[in-house]
Amino acid sequence: MFVSYKWLQEYVNLDGMTPEILAEKITRSGIEVEGIEYKGEGIKGVVIGHVLEREQHPNADKLNKCLVDIGEEEPVQIICGAPNVDKGQKVAVATVGAVLPGNFKIKKAKLRGEASNGMICSLQELGIQGKLVPKEYAEGIFVFPGDAETGADALQSLALDDAVLELGLTPNRADAMNMLGVAYEVAAILGREVKLPETAYQAGAEKAADYISVKIEDPEANPLYAAKIIKDVKIGPSPLWMQTKLINAGIRPHNNVVDVTNFVLLEYGQPLHAFDYDRFGSKEVVIRKAYENETITTLDEQERTLTTEHLVITNGSSPQAVAGVMGGAESEVREDTATVLLEAAYFNGQTVRKASKDLGLRSESSVRFEKGIDPARVRLAAERAADLISRYAGGTVLEGTVEENHLDIKENVIRLSVDKVTKVLGMSISKEEMVNIFERLGFAVEDAERELVVTVPSRRGDIAIEEDLIEEVARLYGYDNIPSTLPEVTGFAGGLTPYQDKRRKVRRFLEGAGLSQAITYSLTNDKKATAYALEKSFKTILSLPMSEERSVLRHSLLPNLLDSVAYNLARQADSAAFYEIGSVFLKAEEHTKPVEKEHVAGAVTGLWHKNLWQGEKKPVDFFVVKGIVEGLLEKLGITEGIEFAQSERKELHPGRTANILHNGSLVGFIGQLHPSVEKELDLSDTYVFELDLHELLRLDVPEITYTPIPKYPSVTRDIALVVDKQTTAGQLEDVIKTAGGKWLKEVHVFDVYEGEHMEEGKKSVAFSLQYLNPEQTLTEEEVTKVHDQVLKALEDKYQAVLRG
């Protein structure tokens, strides 16, 4: 919102306030002033001149020799190339010694042999943007009204001695998107009165209702529509003071009728539209939803195709405007317009936003409807515009306003607890001070003992609850005046929750094992969403995704993690080892919200140990990654009930995949990528794992207890078993641990053999078993007895035979 300092002075006394001081006070009250632009800054020496004579330059077809009175003793000769310069005009003259934008200095000169003592200026040459210059002066010099004083300061007449404050309004402060709204705010800050504009036209004898009727077909989209009729208008330029206000606000002047509607828009925040009554096509205004594929040519000369979601203003048959967005070219005000149909309405913001977005049209009007206007100002703005049109276009306002109204405008009444203000702000503010603040804001206040009953005017739609009033008290009292205090709290030792502590252990262990942390998007595409999922789930699809690649919430961490691995390998990395701790999103039923669960996943490829001087290089394999997972589970104290069971997953290599079970429940998986997946990602020999961290970190695990170093020696026995190929080492190990009892302290595989001298369908698995009694030395007989129990259990369960 651009706010003219000089225009603001018409509504609020700004004595003692420079633009800088005012900007600081506004900012400290909660509305940020993003900048101050001083119009005409650096320009000097420009006056209003009177062209006494104009004749063709004797030596140049496109130059004019002008004699110009600039308010000095003698007129000066100026050579001017503007095509529209003429005798009798009042123009802007940069005198000799003047400075124009860009530090351009005016000097005496000779142009094609003729002296030129100054320069007749266009508005662009005075620093005004070309898009804001009225069309009739776009290609030439600007001409002042005939009553402009010769020799007067041209910058002052063009409001180029003004300062414009740019306000950075938050979405809730739509009330400040107009001059009166800013005036109320500034008056409240400074403790001064607001001077409201007066309306004083004399209505004609004829009644507006005899010329027009109003019918609303969709009260929800358009609850209020008011129309006024102004006859016998004369279309021409608007007064200079109005044009300069529009230009400084960033709006291009057009004519006295259109400029009035834009002026009132800026003044009241109420969008208006003026139709040419005679071109409107009927004596009724019907506001309805457009028909499918109905068309309208808007004021920008573009044909727009409408849908049934767009609200239009019609003459009963054809659209004449897109409600709240832009008028139609068919009934626009033109030079020969004699009667004006003036529209003031309240349109639903969502309806306007929909049409504005669909049609690619965004206007000053649509922005205000979208953010919300004050319904109480609809009629006030219509009256103000009618008064200005009758004053500056010479028209007669017909008696009455024709309207259809479905609005019940009520002011919001809120009860404010004085004690709550003290509690929220952390300091005591007297009731009298609060009353003063609300009255400065223009709110009505009633005293009710420990409460204040505050009536909020409809212009402040952002104030709805008690906390909003407390914010107003804080703003106007001054945030700088509220003392800083530290909260009184009882000291206590901080720390991590058990879950956080375990989560940190996971991260530290994996990083210690050589994996680097990655963080990937929680969103993926439809194809990848369900890949590698630990459990079945319906997809959670975004309604308005930014891209198809980020349209579905993930069920697994691996798809995006593998993309990161592939990305790194494609950039000359020979190995990659990544892990991620993040959320997956699962839902058991389609039309429910997803449950967010934390998982940990890893992906490793390439060399685990590079070729060093003391040994050969070692590539990553299944058992490297399995060892990482086992070490992680052990770090978390989860050593009992864990089983790696061979399984199949379509994304993983058959025969090199295992589910990870805890007491029979699936908590994760491990495996090598399927060759087809590796080919698709341009990877080779890549191993992955994923664990349900949400479940694992909530398991009750036994506390670690101290065990002294054994005093007595252990006994080691090695066994090589011949078993079926389908029997896993893990299955054999489980039997050994169960049968070995309390004296079996350690068991591990040290050899697996398949090949020559081995029966078809068989393999040899060799284990090393360590027996230990912490209380005494085990005898040979005791060890043999337990060892035989182990062998018998293996034979009974898996028909294991000692290899000879």
From Swiss-Prot:
Keywords: Aminoacyl-tRNA synthetase, ATP-binding, Cytoplasm, Ligase, Magnesium, Metal-binding, Nucleotide-binding, Protein biosynthesis, RNA-binding, tRNA-binding
Domain B5: 409-484
Cofactor binding, per record: Binds 2 magnesium ions per tetramer.
GO cellular component: phenylalanine-tRNA ligase complex
Domain FDX-ACB: residue ranges: 710-803
Any GO molecular function: phenylalanine-tRNA ligase activity
Domain tRNA-binding: from-to ranges: 40-155
GO BP: phenylalanyl-tRNA aminoacylation
First-tier enzyme category under EC: ligase
Family indicated by similarity: Belongs to the phenylalanyl-tRNA synthetase beta subunit family. Type 1 subfamily.
Quaternary structure and partners: Tetramer of two alpha and two beta subunits.
Name of the protein in question: Phenylalanine--tRNA ligase beta subunit
Organism the protein comes from: Bacillus licheniformis (strain ATCC 14580 / DSM 13 / JCM 2505 / CCUG 7422 / NBRC 12200 / NCIMB 9375 / NCTC 10341 / NRRL NRS-1264 / Gibson 46)
